[in-house]
Amino acid sequence: MTSPPVLIENRAKSVLKSGDPIIVFNVFESLRPSVVKIASQLGFDMLLVETEHMQHNPETLTSFLVMARDNGLSPIVTIPTATRAGVARLLDAGALGFCLCHAETSEQADDIAR
């Protein structure tokens, strides 16, 4: 039995499985299409989008995350708080993963992982 086709490829995950290092482009302020194009053309695998210290317009963030995926990049987002609702919002917006920078307890991290 074969596996079902992947609907959205996670390039960073594929690179990691191959044993190669993931090349990351950190995006702090400018969520512009040109950033995605430059990162993609230079061969980056992943965009790490900073949302912990920067407030981005939700529509702009969603467009940026989808554009990253459409250009073969894995958008990963830092999250400011350890809430399931916050993580769900970012994943629904198009992030393929998240970086939880400040879990206060192991229970918070476990709750997010569930």
Question: Where is each model-derived feature located?
Answer:
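Expand to "…catalyze enediolate/carbanion chemistry for C-C bond making/breaking, isomerization
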Residues: 1-114
